[in-house]
Amino acid sequence: LTERETCPKDCFHWETCYGNNMMFAHRISHKNQNLLQKRIQEDILALNGKKALIRLHVLGDFFNVDYVKFWKFMLLMFPNIAIFGYTANNTKSKIKLSREIATEIKKLTARFNERFAIRFSNDNDDLFSANSYDVEKPQKGISIVCPEQEGKTETCGTCGFCWTGKQRVLFKTH
């Protein structure tokens, strides 16, 4: 998705988004939501039942409650998919839409906790969050620095902490 167009305005990394350094990344418009969702569903159908771990939103974010509910529908329809990612939406945001989106994400996480792992960015009250190393330092048993960024694993895929770990993950600013 397109960063900032779909992100909550109170995102901690509004100015320092790692998308700033991704000039060749594909940005997909969310403006025709029906078309976007149709294409996503077609991509999932093309898996032909093969298992897939989907990393949502390399750029951008959940932009409305209906879009979150679309992912609920995908999880119900396709037991072969699991989803992980991050959101700057937060239940404590001053922005009503951000709170509503975050609440819906929490419902999905509770219902599909083995298959839907969305970490809340910079939420120091939630152990299943992804926080900036600029804001929080590692605390034993509470948070760790991203193992891939520390060179402790070859890739995110060989690690898996973001979708299985029960502690906060801290990312160094890109």
Q: At which residue positions do the language-model features occur?
A:
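Class I S-adenosyl-L-methionine
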Residues: 1-174
